[in-house]
């Protein structure tokens, strides 16, 4: 059974720009991992009339509503009262919820504030959703054919309750049937139209749906299948996709480009040193965001000025004067210099013009050179990227990681 699901997030801070609404994205992602599709999402401030109107409207059109926020102990936490009024329930002190709140404080060896008792005032005939990580119990309210789940707005608490309390109930409501499954393959180096063109020439196996998404600079290939054989169908579809798009598929699911490069470096035992100019340390940051990066990353330096390139990397004055700091020759010398200085197996260097100023007719903004130095070979390549300064820097750093991935995977 396919469920028609909506998300409602509440709080002034979400609509006035004080905080980003990360809950909607996280809920949609978790639901998607179970095969459920969100049909609608809304964010509403702390306005009783607006929230009540939204709940009534959505409950008449949706099978499931997942609402977050407004379950705290302060006067502006209004969700339980609004839900009770919207669906003709009395607001009552729920002894089970109160016991949970008291137990939470007792386990923390803290005194419960009288205001926290307000969090146990819930609509009649609701099912309590225990909160292991905070004081605000959630609740499940059913009105006609709509199941409504009210969760706290604190992301950590909300995610835990969604996983432990809500998703199993959705699975039960859908008849225990295997929901739609989705597998996402991540592509770098091809545009969305190019990716789609590849599939038009080599269609997926029957029974697999295809969709695309873009998160600069990546394209996401979304493979979807239903039924008991969904896993096997997606395995076949993934193999097909990798064959059709090789070598541009760099990750699947929650994997990342930096994470896979880190894993490959760890598996091979190779060590790396980085020399960055236009990316200003972005490559180093991407890799050091991965736990255990010290096993393979020996050092990384931002050699922004010509003097730094000469002092730290031994780039010759002739190269800088004749070819320029943004050139194949300079990038190659930077890669050699950092590898020799660090004594590593690999040296990776990048130099370029991120803009908005600094471009010339011969070397416009977006000109970037990458170089890889190893004990056995030297590679250098020039690129012309488009976009604003941040986009050029970001795609340049990603291309550097992609270079490493292809080198380590023998995909050149």
Swiss-Prot record:
PANTHER family assigned to the protein according to its UniProt record, in alphabetical order: NICOTINAMIDE-NUCLEOTIDE AMIDOHYDROLASE PNCC, NMN AMIDOHYDROLASE-LIKE PROTEIN YFAY
InterPro entries: CinA (IPR050101), CinA-like_C (IPR036653), CinA_C (IPR008136), Competence-induced_CinA (IPR008135), MoaB/Mog-like_dom_sf (IPR036425), MoaB/Mog_dom (IPR001453)
Protein name: CinA-like protein
Record organism: Syntrophotalea carbinolica (strain DSM 2380 / NBRC 103641 / GraBd1) (Pelobacter carbinolicus)
Highest taxon of source: Bacteria
Pfam families according to UniProt: CinA, MoCF_biosynth
Disulfides per UniProt: none
NCBIfam families (UniProt xref): cinA_nterm (TIGR00200), molyb_syn (TIGR00177), PncC_domain (TIGR00199), PRK00549.1 (NF001813)
Organism taxonomic ancestry: Bacteria, Pseudomonadati, Thermodesulfobacteriota, Desulfuromonadia, Desulfuromonadales
SMART domains: MoCF_biosynth
Sequence similarity: Belongs to the CinA family.
Database matches in Gene3D superfamilies: CinA-like, MoaB/Mog-like domain
